[in-house]
């Protein structure tokens, strides 16, 4: 970005804005998939799909952390991880439900789909939340600025994004690659700044409104600043404890330098990431030069050694100096073992609809952090600086940075692995409920082999917990999607009767007094069309021998202590039975049977014909 052009055109730029908030934001333009800031920095944002890290085995977790360590070692100097919590986007799921309703022919199933659609809309507008995970990179110029710095920044940031994609794929995370990167960046900023408006009006509908406003004001619609499209209409910094952005109230918490635990497990940041609705987390990592940090550590160790010599064992500073010396040696040993030195900062954003709700959420967040021995401080009278720092622009305000920086090595930074989510939300799935841990919708497509290894589900619970209800709910919602469902219920089959009849299903009861039964000896021809389509023509196998083998297994389960002689007799009996049943028909053999069955019918028909003929002659 040419500095002279930006400075000389400042007066003209001030008149370009209709929204003063758009002029206040530190964003100059979005181009080439890069954000150009007003302080002449270049930033790129990528979105990451999370994984359920806490359900992985210890071995898998260790592998993920080691892969994340590899990513941190080759990442840019400044990295900003942002977790955004907002209302769940259910538009794609709703559209799929509507398409299924158009193809449904059964009236009862259509009513079921309408009720399901109302439920999805109600949950999506009030209760359900979702989380989006972003990484923001900043370009760090080497040496003095040169004329081709912009081209170097674009190349550097795109390379950093591709590298992140390769390394995070080893962790199990996928990067979302948008078709239009500039539009994606605008949509991300719109979601961050206009939380309430973005839930009602998507960015695609907001753009024509801004263009219409500029046209009505008589301004050039070809020279609209990009910040006008994602800037909120209201921004209030007049309060010391919170800010008001787009009609929502936000406050900020910092984890100070002394607020972290000395030892943490892998993925400990999931405590904050999945804290609940209205909680955003920003994690900043700043890599420091090794040679300079080794020099500073050695200098500080010498100073602390000289101080502890003058302090007695009963002095209050003795323990703190001793801990500082041990920490210094730990950091120095880690750097010697080829680990990098980072400054880590954690900023927590709390969002609510009213000041009272904001106070309640802030107190609950403090309790949650305190229960895990993590301290926090408020950003009172520095809410504006915290607001700007929470933007995904890799720019933490200096005072907040000094107040919250914590020195960590590469392994400590990797333990903050942030891409952790308990969400299970598939567009083509069925709703099972709301996750009570993080208020996310649980919409599962168990047949999606790209996400799940198989379609097996185990339902466990105490008596009265709702196992049968859940099974019935899944069956009804799978029927809504056109999936054929069979339920084998030995003891509770009657509980499924009404649901089965109301959606046009078939209720089959198998008992000694029932009209339905199962013929275990029937041979049915298997449908191999799908296998032949995939593998081509297949060798025809004997259906009789396969059936006899399965019957042997069936009878061995009924009679476990069957002897070899009995097995041989059973095999002989089965062969004779099928030989008598499956032999080719002989007319001489079946003619007596036909005469036996149809002779009385023939006599009745002849007698009836005579009666009809006699009645006709009498009428004439």
Give the ranges of each region predicted by the language model.
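Extended, folded cores of ATP/NTP-driven motor/assembly subunits in large transport
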Residues: 2-419
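P-loop NTPase motor domains
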Residues: 24, 34, 46-52, 58-74, ...
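Post-Walker A helix-loop "phosphate-sensing" segment adjacent to the P-loop in P-loop NTPases
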Residues: 166, 476-486, 503-505
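Conserved beta-strand scaffold positions in the cores of enzyme catalytic domains, especially
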Residues: 456, 487, 505-509
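Hydrophobic anchor at the beta1->P-loop junction of P-loop NTPases
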Residues: 459
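Walker A (P-loop) phosphate-binding loop of P-loop NTPases
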Residues: 464
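Conserved lysine of the Walker
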Residues: 467
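Hydrophobic positions on the alpha1 helix immediately C-terminal to the Walker A/P-loop
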Residues: 470
């Amino acid at each position: 970005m040419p500095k002279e052009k930006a400075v000389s055109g400042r007066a003209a730029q001030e008149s370009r804005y209709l929204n003063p908030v758009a002029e206040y934001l530190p964003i100059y333009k979005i181009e080439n998939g890069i954000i150009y800031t007003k302080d002449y920095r270049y930033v790129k944002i990528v979105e990451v799909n999370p994984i359920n890290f806490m359900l992985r085995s210890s071995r898998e977790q260790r592998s993920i952390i080691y892969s994340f360590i590899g990513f941190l070692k080759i990442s840019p100097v400044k990295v900003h991880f942002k977790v955004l919590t907002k209302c769940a986007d259910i538009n794609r799921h709703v559209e799929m439900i509507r398409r299924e309703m158009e193809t449904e022919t059964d009236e009862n199933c259509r009513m079921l789909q309408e009720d399901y659609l109302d439920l999805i809309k109600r949950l999506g507008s009030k209760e359900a939340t979702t989380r989006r995970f972003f990484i923001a990179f900043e370009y760090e110029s080497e040496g003095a600025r040169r004329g081709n710095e912009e081209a170097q920044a674009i190349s550097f940031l795109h390379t950093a994004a591709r590298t992140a994609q390769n390394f995070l794929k080893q962790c199990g995370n996928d990067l979302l690659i948008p078709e239009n990167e500039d539009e994606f960046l605008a949509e991300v900023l719109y979601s961050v700044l206009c939380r309430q408006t973005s839930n009602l009006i998507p960015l695609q509908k907001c753009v024509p409104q801004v263009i219409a406003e500029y046209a009505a004001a008589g301004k050039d619609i070809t020279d609209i600043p990009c910040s006008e499209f994602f800037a909120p209409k209201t921004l209030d910094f007049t309060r010391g404890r919170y800010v008001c952005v787009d009609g929502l109230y936000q406050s900020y918490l910092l984890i100070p330098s002394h607020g972290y635990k000395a030892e943490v497990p892998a993925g400990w940041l999931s405590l904050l990431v999945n804290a609940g609705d209205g909680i955003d987390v920003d994690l900043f990592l700043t890599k420091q030069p090794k040679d300079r940090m080794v020099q500073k550590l050695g200098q500080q160790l010498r100073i602390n050694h000289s101080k502890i010599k003058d302090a007695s064992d009963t002095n209050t500073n003795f323990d703190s100096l001793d801990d500082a010396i041990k920490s210094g040696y730990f950091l120095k040993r880690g750097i010697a073992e080829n680990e990098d030195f980072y400054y880590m900062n954690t900023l927590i954003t709390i969002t609510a609809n009213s000041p009272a709700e904001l106070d309640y959420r802030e107190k609950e967040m403090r309790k949650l952090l305190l229960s895990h021995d993590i301290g926090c401080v408020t950003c009172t009278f520095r809410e504006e600086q915290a607001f700007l720092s929470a933007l995904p622009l890799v720019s933490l305000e200096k005072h907040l940075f000094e107040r919250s920086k914590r020195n960590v090595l590469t392994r400590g930074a990797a333990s903050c692995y942030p891409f952790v989510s308990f969400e299970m939300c598939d567009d083509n799935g069925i709703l099972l409920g709301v996750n009570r841990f993080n208020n996310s919708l649980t919409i599962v497509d168990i047949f999606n082999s790209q996400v799940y290894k198989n379609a097996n589900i185990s339902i466990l619970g105490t008596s009265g917990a709702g196992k049968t209800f859940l099974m019935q709910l899944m069956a009804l919602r799978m029927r809504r999607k056109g999936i054929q469902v069979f339920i084998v219920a030995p003891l509770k089959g009657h509980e499924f009767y009404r649901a089965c009849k109301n959606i046009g299903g078939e209720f089959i009861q198998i008992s000694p007094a029932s009209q339905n039964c199962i013929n275990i000896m029937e041979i049915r021809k298997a449908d191999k069309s799908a296998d032949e389509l995939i593998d081509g023509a297949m060798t025809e196998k004997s259906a009789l021998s396969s059936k006899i083998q399965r019957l042997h297994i069936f009878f061995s389960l009924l009679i476990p202590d069957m002897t070899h002689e009995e097995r041989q007799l059973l095999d002989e009996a089965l062969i004779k039975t099928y030989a008598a049943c499956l032999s080719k028909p002989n007319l001489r053999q079946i003619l007596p049977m036909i005469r036996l069955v149809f002779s009385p019918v023939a006599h009745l028909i002849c007698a009836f014909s005579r009666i009809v003929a006699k009645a006709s002659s009498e009428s004439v």
